[in-house]
Amino acid sequence: MKKIKVRYAPSPTGFLHIGNARTALFNYLFAKHNQGEFIIRIEDTDFSRNVKGGEASQLKNLRWLGIDWSEGPDIQGPFGPYRQSERLAIYQKYAQKLLDQGLAYKEFQENTTTFAIRFRVPTNQTFSFDDLIRGKLTFQSQEIEDWVIIKSNGYPSYNFAVVIDDHLMQISHIFRGEEHITNTPKQIMIYQTFQWHLPQFAHMTLILNDNKKKLSKRDANIMQFIEQYEKLGYLPQALFNFLSLLGFSPLSQTEILSPQELINLFDVARLNKAPAMFDTVKLDYLNNQHLRKLTPEVIASFIVQKKYLTLTTAPTNDKEWMTKFVSLFQDRMNYIQQIADFYQLFFQTKPSLSQEATIFLQTNPQTTLILKTFYNVFDVIVFKKDVIFNAIKQVANQNDFSKKTLFMALRIGTTCKMHGPSIALLLELLGKKQVLKNLSYVLKQAQKF
């Protein structure tokens, strides 16, 4: 059996896009599942679209996702160069072979010596291939005009260069978007003309936005680039997980899967024909689940490293405080940058009450006495979680307050919020000074009613 070898061949037009990342991932999963090779090739012959630093950005984003490769522009290999702009002589050689055989011809621009080279499409021929996802697809040659293989500037067209490169680099399988289906008959013509073995194609489903239209870079309500997710604190393994499920239904009891589990489960037979929906709610859920698998210490270190709390007054140099803080909110985080929102929500220096909290104070006359009781208790105790917990328990046991009213009054009085995480640890992290300040403020508001 021929060794499996796949490639991801981006243009260096900027950051790694969601759709391109999915393409890279499917090729990578297929290669790794079958103990094959995954390589990178850069298609950079359209200089008008190339972006400075675009290639480096693509490679950096791929590595962040956890994708590695055995050949590429950065590490080279036996079939290089791996940039199309460095392979022009190769394309010219094969174009000349077609000219010599009368299978291509020069098309001169009017009144100039400048010319393009067009491939002479054979008449009355059928071009078919067995798509690994869609089954047999067939095209007729009369549907296709003679097409340019070398442009007038000397650079190859996409459909010519990609065949030369894939053949010389011994690519066995090609996973790509369904928009490439119409390119395939032109590419088959080149394979057949040179009597080269045809690779196996798999054209992946479209990715749709929440309006069930093809995902576009113009979709302002969906972040389009991997780097954006990295900056917000999405985990690479979570994004790897999410993107792998866009058009793939693994035979698994859970959708929360590690990269290695996805490699083990990858099966071309379970790739979908129907379009895949880019569901940001599902992405947040998956990232939350992957975050829960990490220790608070790991997330705390990440927060400090990425400086997610630099715009707050959080004591980021206090590792113990940061770890406890993360443990409070870890299960609530969809992405790590949300930690700053949680901090601002609870650790505001100027207390204020929501309308919902104000209504509670108005409709529960016991609140004033409860707040006074807790103020007096908290004023004299050591402000550590266990001590705070026992103090709250003692107040609850020694007084005839309604438990529901007592605990809601406690939460509003100490945090100015109706809802939140474990109260004892939260109060320890807030500190006695801030807690008493909040209690004093809320008590004054309650006494107005």
UniProtKB/Swiss-Prot annotation:
> Catalytic activity, per the record?
tRNA(Glu) + L-glutamate + ATP = L-glutamyl-tRNA(Glu) + AMP + diphosphate
Q: What residue ranges carry the coiled-coil annotation?
A: none
Q: How does it assemble?
A: Monomer.
Chief place of localization:
cytoplasm
Q: Any idea where this protein resides?
A: Cytoplasm
Motif segment ('HIGH' region): 10-20
What GO molecular function terms would the record report?
ATP binding; glutamate-tRNA ligase activity; tRNA binding; zinc ion binding
Question: Residue ranges for motif 'KMSKS' region?
Answer: 214-218
What are the annotated GO cellular component locations? cytosol
Pfam (any one): tRNA-synt_1c
Q: What does this protein do?
A: Catalyzes the attachment of glutamate to tRNA(Glu) in a two-step reaction: glutamate is first activated by ATP to form Glu-AMP and then transferred to the acceptor end of tRNA(Glu).
GO BP, sorted A to Z:
glutamyl-tRNA aminoacylation
Q: Where does ATP bind?
A: 217
Q: What is this protein called?
A: Glutamate--tRNA ligase
Upper lineage: Bacteria, Bacillati, Mycoplasmatota, Mollicutes, Acholeplasmatales
**Source organism, top-level taxon:** Bacteria
Instruction: Return the similarity comment.
Output: Belongs to the class-I aminoacyl-tRNA synthetase family. Glutamate--tRNA ligase type 1 subfamily.
Report keywords, A-Z: Aminoacyl-tRNA synthetase, ATP-binding, Cytoplasm, Ligase, Nucleotide-binding, Protein biosynthesis
- InterPro entries (alphabetical): aa-tRNA-synth_I_cd-bd (IPR045462), aa-tRNA-synth_I_codon-bd_sub2 (IPR020751), aa-tRNA-synth_I_CS (IPR001412), aa_tRNA-synth_I_cd-bd_sf (IPR008925), Glu-tRNA-ligase_bac/mito (IPR004527), Glu/Gln-tRNA-synth (IPR000924), Glu/Gln-tRNA-synth_Ib_cat-dom (IPR020058), GluQ/Sye (IPR049940)
What EC number is given for this enzyme? 6.1.1.17
